[in-house]
Amino acid sequence: MGQLTKKFGKIPVSLGIPHLLNLQVDSYVKFLQEGLAERKTDEGLEGVFRSVFPIEDFNRTASLEYVSYDIGEPKFDQAECISKGLTYEAPIRIKVRLVVYDVDDDSGNRTIRDIKEQDIYFGTLPLMTEKGTFIINGTERVIVNQLQRSPGIIFEHDSGKTHSSRKVLYSCRVIPMRGSWLDFDFDHKDILYVRIDRRRKMPATILFKAMGMTKTDILDYFYKKEFYRISADGRVFWEVQKDMFRKDSAFADIAGPDGTVFVKAGKPITKRAWRQICEAGLETIEVAADTLDGLFLADDVVNPATGEVLAEAADEVTPGVQERLREAGIDRLPILHTKGIDTSSSLRDTLVLDKTADKEAAQVEIYRRLRPSSPPTPEIAESFFDNLFRSADYYDLSPVGRYKLNQRLGLDQSLELRVLTDEDILTAIRVLLHLKDSHGPADDIDHLGNRRVRPVGELVENQYRIGLVRMERAIKERMSLQEVSTLMPHDLINPKPVAAVLKEFFGTSQLSQFMDQTNALSEVTHKRRLSALGPGGLTRERAGFEVRDVHTSHYGRICPIETPEGPNIGLIVSLTTYAKVNDYGFIETPYHVIRDTKMTGEVVYLDASREHGEVIAQANAPFDAEGKLADEYVTTRVKGDVLMSPREEVTLMDVSPSQMVSISAALIPFLEHDDANRALMGSNMQRQAVPLLQCEKPLVGTGMEGPVAQDSGACIIAEGPGIVRYADADRIIVSYENGLYPERGGVRAYDLQKFHKSNQNSCFGQKPTCHPGQIVAKGDILADGPGIEDGELALGKNLVVAFMPWCGYNFEDSILISERTVKEDTFTSVHIEEFEVVARDTKLGPEEITRDIPNVGEDMLRNLDGSGIIRIGANVKPDDILVGKITPKGETQLTPEEKLLRAIFGDKARDVKNTSLKVPPGIEGTVIEVKVFNRRSGEKDERARLIEEYELGRLDRKEQDHIRGLGDATRVKLMAVVEGKQIATTLAGKKKGEVIAEAGASVTAEMLADVPLKKLSGLFKNREVNEAVDALLESYDQQVQFISNIYESKRGKVTEGDDLPPGVIKMVKVYIAVKRKLSVGDKMAGRHGNKGVVSCILPAEDMPFFADGRPVDIVLNPLGVPSRMNIGQIMETHLGWAAKEMGRQLAEMLERNDPLKALRNEVKRAFDSPAIDSLVDSMDDEDFRASVAKLGRGIVTKTPVFDGAAEEEIWSWLVRANIDEDGKTVLYDGRTGERFHNRVTTGVMYMLKLHHLVDEKIHARSTGPYSLVTQQPLGGKAQFGGQRLGEMEVWALEAYGAAYLLQEFLTVKSDDVTGRVKMYEKIVKGDNFLEAGLPESFNVLVKELMSLGLDVTLHQEEGKKRPKRVGFMNAL
């Protein structure tokens, strides 16, 4: 029976949280397209193959075409790959076709001569586990999703920062998925330049000409024409065009045909007057005679008599030009409209600057700029230009890029068109010109509409394409070198380039990361992480403040809280709880649709661009009885701003208050009362919590604990309705009823992990929560994982906390904790260390793993078996031998004495040295597992044979359990068919002569309980029943055979030996479980960023205690709360205390055997929830008692973020629990028994132990390794280094006058080589005097000065007395 839980949330949850690993798993499934009847040809692996094939040779005499691919079964399962250090991968085979052509020399036509089709092994492909991870070389890795600038077009300006004039310069950039970038930008003179691939800039009109446009075409496209008439008397008239409104002042009165004056001379033309002028039908308006000066011609002006070009298009109309035109009798001039509100002459000015004449010249110029080294010809230049943006082989916008281009430029091109068209470029320039001339706003590059997620599938797809392109080059070369007609496809294809690229990506890429496996939460958050770093992304050094900052478009998509502290802040972020990534890679968040102030029940997922302009209400907006928005004005978000909008305008509404934060932040109760900085620390530190030996879920939770634990993959969850057939600590067997696993008869066996080492060395183990015979439904928890209780995350412990100072032991966030937590193993965790030893074949002979080690006493070998490997269960401490190993030594020159002994006692024993694997310092624990790996052809030692026998026995037991479970399930199915049916013959029992039923008897369940299934064949009178029974038995036999084959394959893998690296004879891995109890120096934290280090573990009797004698568990500093502003911890403390006390009171009522009716009423009063009332009423007495008994530890409460318990509710709970409303109480000093002066805030807080454990960090050194150059001790625990003495420490010692101590530190204990030797000699002789020499670092300095050309010599002055000798032991 589940635990009774009090939920404080008031907003109904109408939409479930999507599976937390969907992004990873779905992306890779889409990439593989495995098992699909018809694969999509433009995406995933299929799309990659189709984009590279067909491959033709240079003469077009042969073509290698791709047909299909097939992914096989992996050779080893996931557990075997982790154990043996292998990659979890599957073989991939491709079917290709080689077509050979005959080419006609004259016509160039091709005819098919030969076709060869072949299946080819194409290497392996790493597979994703169901948990969203990859197993590479035996370790679990995660491919982090990359957050990258989206392909498409973006318009920007420099905000006046580029040029000294502070002029705002506009630019635009077209970014493809693959191919050349195209940049257009203005300089301070308003000339428009283009850059291709960020090379040297050139006037943009060169690009237009290269596209085939003439000078006139360019002007006609970008400018409107206006016409001016010049009368014989020199007056100038402007022809009225309705769509060309002039704001100028009138030169003369503008009047209609009837004499009505619309605008008086000298007055500006208004829009109203312009409308009247157009309606009156005026054809021309007189303008000033000098109006034409400085304008530009729209067309070439030709002398009608002679055909001579008097002025060219784009020429400026100067008085001289006007004179020439007047002489030729031309009275109507076409002029470029450059004086409008939002038009300028910038493109015309660019055209004048451009000296290229035509298309050919422009293409040659572009070729010269991009390929300055090679001389161009028109043909090469044209081909090169066409390949830049128009060829699908070299340029790919991708559907995303085309979608963004269409969206921004208002085009309606097909998403299949993935190259740039002339229309795209011209429209982009038109939009850019309009933006510049109207001083419009630039696009926001940090808006999530302009950033997209590249999930794992796309990242691997890109790597696969790189590998295939490399292979393509090799294939083309091979085709040209050899006679293709004699070749088969497998002669041409070599998959090694693809394998190398994949290996590099999964092994060393910045986005392929060692999985953070500290606990279930850290696994899930790592898979939901988005990184702006990585190839093609940003770098820490270049990323500015803007890209790291929280943006309004992040709402509901990216968590504003969870990000690392330090240099990566804001660059690595997390998806929010409800966020999804759509097919284009944009992050979407769900909303309820609101129509006519009513919620429609429809939910839409929108990306940041599509959300623009919607009026979005918060999830807590109240509704009235009719289901309409209750308030006249509602708090809404519109285009990122928070407004009060009329309820009629609301179009969407948030689905949940927790949709704006990530899962880590959603696990913090009362998040709304915490400062964001502390919430960031809180969400990060929960990921560092070590799973404890005894899990306990928080009394004050948020409701996110269940989804996180269940989606993490750490639990085992029922996949459908069924019955548990078998359950123990090692495995659970379930028979499912809904057609799952038909080949196994619906029976699935789950192996539970026991003492499994995680990536962070924490101990992962699963424990069953079900029992045999239990009926389960889909989603039920069958087994809990590490740090999980009842399918809910349980990373810490509920402790009774007091906020008070205690003798300075909680100064600066230090933590005082009760010794009871150590005695009861409250914060004890198990960590597993792996040690490996390898026996190699050396030049001097093979190394050997053996118990026979020279010069080692029997007491050191007592735990080793005959093979020299430690026994399981041995308790080991530092310097104990785990695996005995000897290595041959080189022959040494013998002394005469040794030669004499050799002559007397015969040949010496082999000259070997002891290279045994020993326990390193700081490790003390129990050996829990040993693995021995032998070469396939190698001899197995006794220990290897024992391990093999054990593994085979375990597999046999598993197979029998599995078949037994299948038999039980089949028996149930048979009973449904035969129950009540009559048997035709006597049914005999197992014992000789035993009769279970006579012929004609009706079958019952008891009758068939012990009868072997085979005996039921042909037993019944009814022929149809016999046929049904035979069909079931036949199916059972096939399923048994299927299961047997699986286990036979596993047995073969156990016995066949291992693939070891070259030169390795044998490898042994030893696993030691280390129990780490809580100790002084361990780091602990709450969920609100309240971290600290344990400063003192105090006996329980000395801890402050309540009036009834119960001591508190932990004492925290009250000064840690006000300045940090994380008040959530205080609210959690109060609510936790009330929950614990009320639970205790209810459990005491149960123990006192109070009447159940009174107890039921008390439970209802405590929970105060209609849902709990009906649940309590529906329970029988036994279930009710069990549920109340669980409340003894406290009532589990759920207070969701932004929708949690209000202060009034917490106060009312405190009052119900008979606690003072202010949450303070009187405490007594455990040492004196006296009451503390002030009442103290006490309660229950959930505390975590973090993986920064003092036992893993502390170490001590007497002597150890030294640096070669400086001769100073190395640093760090891994190098067994010394303690660094910095200048501040030197000052402190100087201040104390500890001169000899300081001299010792700076010389013999550091880098005085001769002084070290002398000191050792003196200690041995008992002559304890310090004689310091010259530090080696001084010699290094001298050598450095010499390297700079300075001659440095040392002189000792005569007559100087040496200092008096002082004993260095006395100086201490």
UniProtKB/Swiss-Prot annotation:
Name of one Pfam family that matches: RNA_pol_Rpb2_7
GO molecular function, one term: DNA binding
GO biological process, one term: DNA-templated transcription
Keywords, alphabetical: DNA-directed RNA polymerase, Nucleotidyltransferase, Transcription, Transferase
Keyword Amino-acid biosynthesis tagged: no
Reaction catalyzed: RNA(n) + a ribonucleoside 5'-triphosphate = RNA(n+1) + diphosphate
Ranges that cross the membrane: none
One GO term describing the cellular component: DNA-directed RNA polymerase complex
Keyword Iron-sulfur: no
The EC number(s) this enzyme carries: 2.7.7.6
Cited NCBIfam families: PRK00405.1 (NF001616), rpoB (TIGR02013)
Assembly mode: The RNAP catalytic core consists of 2 alpha, 1 beta, 1 beta' and 1 omega subunit. When a sigma factor is associated with the core the holoenzyme is formed, which can initiate transcription.
UniProt family annotation: Belongs to the RNA polymerase beta chain family.
Known role: DNA-dependent RNA polymerase catalyzes the transcription of DNA into RNA using the four ribonucleoside triphosphates as substrates.
Protein name (Swiss-Prot/TrEMBL): DNA-directed RNA polymerase subunit beta
Organism the protein comes from: Nitratidesulfovibrio vulgaris (strain DSM 19637 / Miyazaki F)
Gene: rpoB
